[in-house]
A protein has these predicted regions:
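N-terminal Rossmann-like NAD(P) cofactor-binding subdomain of oxidoreductases
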Residues: 1-139
Length: 139
């Protein structure tokens, strides 16, 4: 049996509907180690408080400010539209080896004018759109 390195991940927006489903799936993946679960409310609570299906012992919910970015390989963003682009813009230029998977609409539409028309939000990270890839992984 070969040994695989575990991927160190964070889930930002972990206590929302999509975030909880993602945490459940990641908690069962043999090659994923969840290092951080982040939200803006209910800090310090166990993730199982929000979803009883999550049985694995995981880090307690914390704020984004507590993330140790250098210890991560991948960040999942399950945030409202308009929020992921701000965070990615801020963090991408500081650590270009970080990979982000955004579950919102922020990098779904590559034309900023169409994005604005659909979501009534000005895109704040236009230069980063070229680094993004949108797909529907059917989580």
């Amino acid at each position: 049996m070969s040994k695989h390195k575990k991927l160190n991940v964070a889930v930002i927006g972990a206590t929302g509907y999509t975030g909880l489903d993602l945490v459940l799936m990641l908690s069962k993946h043999p090659y994923v180690k969840i290092n951080s679960l982040c939200a803006t409310k209910n800090l310090g609570k166990k993730i199982s408080f929000f979803d009883k299906r999550i049985k694995k012992k995981l880090p307690k919910v914390t704020s984004i400010n507590k993330i140790k970015w250098d210890n991560l390989d991948l960040i999942f963003l399950s945030l409202p539209n308009g929020e992921a682009q701000k965070l990615i813009k801020k963090k991408f230029y500081k650590n270009k080896k970080l990979k982000f998977i955004d579950l919102s609409a922020d990098f779904r539409i590559i034309n900023p004018k169409i994005y604005k028309k659909n979501y009534n939000i000005n895109h704040k990270a236009i230069k980063l759109i070229k680094y993004s890839l949108y797909s529907v992984p059917e989580l």
